[in-house]
Amino acid sequence: MHREAGFPLDYRSTGYAYVERPNSVLVELLQRYVLDARPEARIVDVGCGAGANARRISLRAPRARVVGVEPNADAAQLARAACSEVFQGTLTEWLASAPQGQFDALLLSDVLEHTVDPIGFLRSFSELPALRGATLVLSVPNYGVWYNRLRTLAGRFEYQWSGLYDRTHLRFFTRRSLHKLLDYAGFELVADDCTPSVLQSMAPLLRRVFEKDVAQGNHLALANSRAFAAYERLVEPLEKRVCELWPELLGFQIVCVAKLR
C-alpha cells in the first residue's frame, strides 16, 4: 500500500469506516438526459466504488449496461454484483485495454477533484473513440458549502479521511469555477444541480453507527438500510427544494451534465 506523509492513500485498506451511498441527484440527471431516451444505454462509471450508483441505475433502467472502473480490489469485487462488467484498475489502465464499442454516458462521481490536471483529463475524452459523443455526468464536492465557509472563517483547514477535505483531493471547486473549467475543457453545460448538505454534515455520526458493518466489508450498509430509504423518501426531497434556493451555499456537491462541443 502506498503512503504519503505517513498516511495510507487507500483508506479502504485501513480501519477507517468508509460508508458508501448512492448519489441520487447524479442518477436522476443520468436518467433525464440519457436513460429516458436510451434505456439500454452503455455507461462507464469511473471510480464506481462498491457499486452504489450502479445499483440505482439498474433499478431505473434494467436494460442499461454499466461498466465499472475501480482501482480498489475489495470495492471492485462488491461492484460486480451491480455492474455488467468491472475493470479493476485506473481509468488510464482501462483506456489502455482498448474497450470495444461506443458508450452513451461517462459518470465521474467525485473523481475530478482527485486529478492533477482536470482540464487535460476532460479534454482527453474527445480523443477516445469509445467515449466520443458520450454525455458527461459528473459531481464534485462544493468548496462553497455553508459549513466550509464557517471553517474557513475560523481559519481551519485540516485534511480528513473523507468529505471536502479528503486527503486525496488535489483540486477544489465552486459552482462557478466548475462551469468555467467545463467550458475551458471544450464542454457545453447542459444542466446543473446540487446535492443537499445535511446528511453529509452528519458523516462522523454515520460512520460510528455503521462501523461494525464496514469492518465486515459491508460498505453499502447505509445505502441498504431502512433509515436511508426513509431519508430519501421523506427528508431528501424537502432538503433538495431548500438547497435549490441557494445551491452555491447549501449544496454539498455540484452535479453537472455536459456534452463535448
Report the location of each language-model feature.
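Conserved S-adenosyl-L-methionine
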Residues: F187-V198
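Short, conserved SAM-binding segment of the class I
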Residues: G120-L128, L181
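A short SAM/SAH-binding and catalytic strip from SAM-dependent methyltransferases
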Residues: A105-D117
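Conserved beta-strand signature within the Rossmann-like core of class I S-adenosyl-L-methionine
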Residues: R132-V140
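Helix-to-beta-strand junctions that scaffold the AdoMet/dcAdoMet cofactor pocket
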Residues: T115-V116, P129-R132
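Conserved N-terminal segment of class I S-adenosyl-L-methionine
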Residues: M1-G101, A105, I119-L122, L138, ...
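Short, glycine-/aromatic-enriched active-site segment of Class I SAM-dependent methyltransferases
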Residues: G144-H169
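Short alpha-helix
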Residues: L170-A185
